[in-house]
């Protein structure tokens, strides 16, 4: 069906009329949201907020937590719940986030991305085009929740399905909605050819039509960055300039930093049990298993790096979907799975080797930590949008995975460690600015 949300809801309503209560699906009948039992919400909570965070990265979860923490200071009785997938649910549990119980029924976006990936390769646009059934399945769960519970505000951080299907069917909207994103539209990879350029242009045209045909559907649209972070150029042939269009339809907050107040670096290093004199290198590849190839390439470079940097201590953060047992670790290398305070390690270490995700690279930039980043091949955000943003801060060194050897990785590490010019400062109030905009909707 061209309009699967509407068809599914018609089928649901038809079945509801003809099934007994015992036969009906339990979806929509939920127990109390899960979270830290010490967190208690007043029965007279001023507002109920449903946060819907993208499944694509833990960094997006960290920024949403930062925004939520500010919201709680502005509205002490607020009830914030997350509709989220693993591994984000683990991050939320570690930070007292309340997870809506329907989250356990969500289809896995992370598993889909992993199935679409190759050796340090992920054609993000093509992967998105092939996840329709995941988007619609998760939207149906979302719609059941907002129809059966009284939420005052939905905060959709790159929750593409929610935004798309509510725009297609505005009558389904049940609460105020705030759209949060760190990118506007799709960009074709230069090497992908004319077909991808035509397809991204069509997707962008549909997005523009949705927003301009229903200008009041989004109660606010927040770009998590600054106007300069949008690359120059149009959305495609015959379409508006992306930056100019975004300036008309978005409010800009700067990037919300989870590590905005991590404290003095020496104290932070001590709290993480980093020893004086160590040169700590953190390797981090995000919340999916796509980064396994990058970890192996970096591990192969470790013996050379250790020879050149005798005080080197390498800590690999494999992430929640990769077991440390997966890797043949050289002597002296530590490997950890899920680390809920990764942002602190990124702020405290001497150098980081990471994938090309925006959240991680911006956290490193804000902390002033030197880093190398290896964008996933074919991933337009990591190859086009992230480097464009980082250039404004003179931060990070972009490395091409396919061209990187052990020697070139070590040489780049040495150059970054000895670099004297500091990165440009990053605004620290992005979470506060975003939360204040959201607060106006409560």
Region spans (language model):
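A nucleotide-sugar donor-handling region in carbohydrate enzymes
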Residues: 187-289, 319-321
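A donor-sugar binding/catalytic signature common to diverse glycosyltransferases
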Residues: 341-385
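Conserved nucleotide-sugar donor-binding subdomain of glycosyltransferases
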Residues: 116-163
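Active-site proximal beta-strand in glycosyltransferases
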Residues: 170-188
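Conserved nucleotide-sugar phosphate-binding/catalytic loop shared by glycosyltransferases and other
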Residues: 74, 78-130
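Catalytic active-site module of serine/aspartate enzymes centered on a nucleophile-bearing elbow/loop
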Residues: 1-32
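Donor-nucleotide binding loops and adjacent catalytic segments primarily
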Residues: 253-351
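A short, glycine/small-residue-rich beta-strand->loop->alpha-helix junction that serves as a flexible
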Residues: 53-65, 291-293
């Amino acid at each position: 069906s061209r309009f699967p949300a509407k068809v599914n809801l018609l089928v649901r309503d038809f079945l509801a009329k003809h099934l007994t209560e015992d036969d009906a699906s339990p979806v929509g009948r939920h127990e109390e949201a899960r979270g830290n039992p010490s967190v208690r919400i007043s029965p007279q909570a001023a507002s109920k907020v449903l946060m819907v965070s993208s499944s694509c990265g833990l960094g997006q979860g960290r920024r949403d937590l930062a925004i939520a923490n500010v919201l709680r200071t502005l509205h002490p009785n607020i009830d914030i719940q997350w509709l989220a997938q693993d591994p984000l649910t683990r991050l939320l549990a570690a930070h007292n986030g309340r997870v809506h119980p329907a989250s356990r029924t969500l289809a896995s976006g992370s598993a889909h991305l992993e199935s679409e990936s190759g050796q340090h390769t992920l054609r993000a646009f093509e992967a998105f085009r092939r996840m329709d059934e995941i988007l619609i399945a998760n939207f149906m769960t979302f719609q059941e929740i907002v129809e059966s519970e009284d939420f005052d505000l939905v905060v959709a951080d790159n929750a593409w399905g929610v935004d798309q299907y509510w725009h297609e069917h505005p009558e389904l909207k049940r609460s105020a909605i705030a759209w949060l994103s760190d990118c506007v539209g799709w960009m074709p990879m230069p090497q992908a050819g004319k077909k991808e350029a035509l397809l991204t242009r069509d997707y962008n045209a549909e997005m523009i039509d949705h927003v301009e045909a229903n200008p009041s559907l989004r109660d606010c649209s927040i770009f998590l960055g600054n106007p300069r972070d949008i690359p120059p150029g149009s959305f495609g042939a015959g379409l508006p300039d992306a930056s100019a269009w975004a300036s008309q339809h978005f409010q800009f907050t700067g990037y919300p930093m989870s590590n905005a107040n991590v404290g003095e670096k020496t104290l932070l290093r001590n709290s993480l049990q980093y020893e004086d004199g160590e040169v700590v290198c953190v390797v981090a590849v995000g919340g999916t298993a796509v980064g396994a190839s990058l970890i192996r390439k970096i591990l192969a470079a470790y013996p050379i790096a250790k020879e050149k940097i005798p005080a080197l201590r390498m800590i690999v953060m494999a992430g929640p979907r990769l077991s440390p047992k997966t890797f043949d670790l050289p002597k002296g290398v530590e490997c950890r799975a899920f680390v809920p305070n990764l942002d602190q390690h990124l702020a405290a270490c001497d150098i980081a080797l990471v994938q090309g995700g925006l959240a991680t690279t911006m956290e490193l930039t804000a902390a002033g930590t030197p880093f190398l980043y290896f964008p996933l091949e074919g991933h337009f955000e990591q190859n086009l949008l992230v480097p464009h943003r980082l250039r404004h801060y003179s931060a990070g060194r972009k490395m091409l995975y396919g061209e990187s050897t052990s020697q070139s990785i070590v040489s780049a590490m040495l150059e970054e460690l000895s670099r004297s010019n500091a990165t440009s400062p990053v605004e620290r109030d992005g979470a506060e600015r975003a939360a204040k905009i959201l607060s106006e909707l409560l």
